[in-house]
Amino acid sequence: MSRRGTAEEKTAKSDPIYRNRLVNMLVNRILKHGKKSLAYQIIYRAVKKIQQKTETNPLSVLRQAIRGVTPDIAVKARRVGGSTHQVPIEIGSTQGKALAIRWLLAASRKRPGRNMAFKLSSELVDAAKGSGDAIRKKEETHRMAEANRAFAHFR
């Protein structure tokens, strides 16, 4: 039996300008080689572009995009009797948001375009409208989970 106590769950900090945890999560995921100031620049430029494109509150567009891409269920590889099955599992809200952010950034990196801020803003606007690569990834994950529903008892 372990003598160590359980670790406290860390809460995500909020960013300096918008005081929003989602923006901070996005910054931490877009971060490369420790260049956090560049990550903040990219995010804030993307938010400005969203403001120009939609003429609505950019944070509500961001929230709507992340809510639209967040998966409810995913598949996890589980080895049972020599064969690997894709077992559908439910996803918690924090893990779902993290996955959604990862998918949004991956989809925006794939996009053709000038710079990351432009590509990210385009992907976020598309995701808020219900289209784009990140939404397609979510639907594909849900389809995989539905197809492998028979293996749900392997959890």
UniProtKB/Swiss-Prot annotation:
One of its GO terms (biological process) is translation. It comes from Daucus carota (Wild carrot). Keywords: Chloroplast, Plastid, Ribonucleoprotein, Ribosomal protein, RNA-binding, rRNA-binding. Belongs to the universal ribosomal protein uS7 family. This is Small ribosomal subunit protein uS7cz/uS7cy. Transmembrane segments: none annotated. The keyword Electron transport does not apply. HAMAP family: Ribosomal_uS7_B. PROSITE patterns: RIBOSOMAL_S7. One of its GO terms (cellular component) is chloroplast. Part of the 30S ribosomal subunit. It is found in: Plastid, Chloroplast. Pfam families: Ribosomal_S7. The keyword Lyase does not apply. One of the primary rRNA binding proteins, it binds directly to 16S rRNA where it nucleates assembly of the head domain of the 30S subunit. GO terms for molecular function: rRNA binding; structural constituent of ribosome.
